[in-house]
Design a protein with these regions (language model features):
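Structural preference for beta-strand elements that scaffold enzyme active sites
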Residues: 129-134, 196, 240-244, 325-329, ...
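Conserved, mostly hydrophobic/aromatic
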Residues: 33, 134, 189, 199, ...
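Active-site groove signature of glycoside hydrolases
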Residues: 251, 313-339, 446-450
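Aromatic- and carboxylate-lined catalytic core of secreted/periplasmic carbohydrate-active enzymes
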Residues: 431, 500-539
Length: 560
């Protein structure tokens, strides 16, 4: 199927189409729609919904350039998330709606309206940034790593040992990477073009992934302790880079000090932090039934105070002195605060954002949501999403080797992969990003792979890797380099993807490193790639094309 999209009217939330990307409530905003010559628009109106009630604003023809008419209207931003869409009447008596999903003859759903978000401006440094994801145990070891005493749970491995295929032992396999090793390799990360270092959890735990925290008070001594994090962040900041932490607000480990204080102890202050299934507090709700990961109960005011609310909370502590993290990626954000009839997720995420803003308004908040994330990402808290539905899945399904089986992890997170053509990939992408306000879309992670899924290269057809990396770097969002992608590492599932980096073979990876560096450098030199709009031009089986547009210029991208 070949789809030509260049002849459709277009609008998005970028500066070429919206006069103020970060308005305050009560401010007036002008919006423009681009209508190709010959489409035949005779009247254009903007439908807004102040306080939920539809209201129409007349647009006027506002200049033209060769082959294009511009229509413009102004309205007042009445609500924190202000929805709008366009109605375009034609000379032949027909009318079409234009919303974030595209052009429609029939009335579309309100959920896919364009949205302007008022207040709580995301940090400017996140626009156009490139992220590098670090899994500390497998990234690099500093000179002092080997001198640390290992806990009982750890099963030591040599750096060149393969990941244990017996998944009963994988989480305990300990390679000894630490934060000092990350600091020593900042040259490498920056050389790839990355300016955000995203660290998976650094708190003490009983696994190498550390998503089963046993405390949030200190950095794991196995990673070098608090001092190592302070040193890493200072070194990164000295280079103009940012460091993002990883915090799990859905659960902790069953060895966590709060859980240990409550387990089997009815009446303990921490009892209200968890969901108990018996009066003795010996059985409890956990993440997906995994007993080592008890689930937090966010009905507890004391849990909120200790963990997410105010200057003394865990959320605040690591953003302030002396640590100065630049933000959080929240693990399992989609499940946080949700259990049966409880849905405290909106409250929890807004409290986290408010606390972060009070400590340092120049911090970034990303939430993990593995599926359709739009409903939770209206711009009220999360600046962007770590999701697989809008970028990862369409790119995989288009550029995978036809008929190749889905690896473990990917199927769990985003469903079984399929064989799609380019037009399918574009259609799916447009479907899933339609619900994001523009400022959320530009800060949502474009990940080809992560620590939770197979490596893209495992499934990619010949020649597809440069195309996929190019899409990650040029589509709206935060491109993500998962450690090891630049080495061409493989991985059949999430665990197998966490292979220690082969620093001794750095020279053999230079071509791929250069690929990342060249593509990332475009984001420094082309303002269209930071927050510029995206207008689709073409989609067919083997090629897609789009224009990234900004007041400074237009960049046309063709992927084939």
């Amino acid at each position: 199927v070949t789809v030509s999209l260049s002849s459709d009217p277009h609008h998005d939330g970028s500066a070429l189409y919206v006069s103020n990307l970060d308005p305050e409530l009560g401010e007036s905003v002008r919006v423009r729609v681009r209508v190709p010559d010959g489409w035949g628009a005779t009247r254009v109106r903007v439908r807004v919904r102040p306080d939920g009630e539809p209201f129409y604003v007349e647009a006027t023809r506002h200049g033209s350039v060769p082959h294009v008419e511009w229509w413009e209207a102004a309205f007042t931003v009445e609500n924190p998330q202000h929805p709008y869409r366009f109605r375009l009447d034609r000379g032949d008596g027909t009318a079409h709606w234009l919303n974030a999903r595209g052009l429609h003859r029939l009335d579309p759903r309100d959920a896919d309206d364009f949205r302007i978000v008022a207040g709580d401006v995301p940090p400017a440094w996140s626009a156009g940034a490139v992220m590098y994801q670090v899994f500390p145990d497998r990234f690099a070891r500093s000179a002092t790593a080997s001198s640390r005493e290992l806990p009982e749970w750890a099963e030591p491995a040599a750096w060149t040992d393969p990941v244990d295929p017996d998944r009963r032992h994988t989480a305990a396999q300990f390679y000894g990477g630490d934060l000092g090793g990350v600091e020593e390799r900042l040259d490498h990360i920056q050389g790839l073009g990355a300016d955000i270092v995203y660290l998976t959890p650094v708190f003490p735990a009983r696994s190498n992934h550390r998503y089963d925290a046993l405390s949030f008070e200190h950095v794991d001594p196995l990673l070098g302790g608090d001092g190592a994090l302070i040193s890493l962040v200072e070194a990164a900041h000295g280079r103009g880079m940012r460091v993002l932490g990883d915090l799990t607000t859905n659960h902790c480990g069953d060895a966590h000090e709060w859980f240990q204080a409550a387990y089997g102890t009815p009446g303990a202050p921490e009892s209200e932090f968890f969901y108990w299934l018996d009066a003795e507090q010996l059985t409890y709700v956990s993440w997906l039934g995994v007993p080592s990961l008890p689930k937090f109960n966010w009905n507890s005011a004391e849990l909120r105070r200790r963990f997410i609310e105010g200057p003394d909370s865990v959320v605040a502590k690591w953003l302030g002195a002396p640590f100065h993290l630049d933000g959080w990626r929240i693990d399992v954000a989609n499940m946080t605060g949700r259990y049966r009839t409880d849905d405290l997720n909106p409250e929890v995420r807004r409290i986290i954002r408010r606390t972060m803003t009070e400590v340092n308004p120049d911090t970034l908040l990303l939430g993990e949501f593995t599926g359709d994330a739009a409903a939770d990402f209206a711009g009220d808290a999360w600046h962007g999403a770590m999701t697989y539905a809008n970028f990862t899945r369409p790119v995989w399904n288009w550029l995978r080797t036809p008929g190749s089986p889905a690896g473990g992890g990917l199927s769990m997170i985003v469903g079984e992969t399929q064989d799609w053509d380019g037009s399918d990939a574009v259609a799916s992408h447009r479907e899933f990003v339609a619900g994001f306000p523009w400022r959320v879309r530009t800060r949502t992670m474009n990940a080809l792979d992560t620590h939770d899924i197979p490596r893209f290269v495992n499934d990619a057809r010949d020649g597809a890797v440069p195309v996929a990396v190019g899409l990650a770097m040029t589509m709206p969002g935060l491109p993500v380099i998962w450690q090891g992608d630049e080495f061409g590492l493989t991985g059949s599932d999430g665990e197998d993807s966490r292979t220690p980096l082969p620093w001794d073979s750095l020279s053999s990876a230079r071509d791929r490193i250069a690929l990342y560096s060249r593509l990332a450098s475009l984001r420094d030199t082309r303002p269209e790639l930071a927050e510029g709009g995206l207008r689709w031009l073409h989609a067919s089986a083997e090629a897609i094309a789009f224009a990234r547009e900004a007041p400074e210029g237009v960049l046309v991208v063709v992927a084939a």
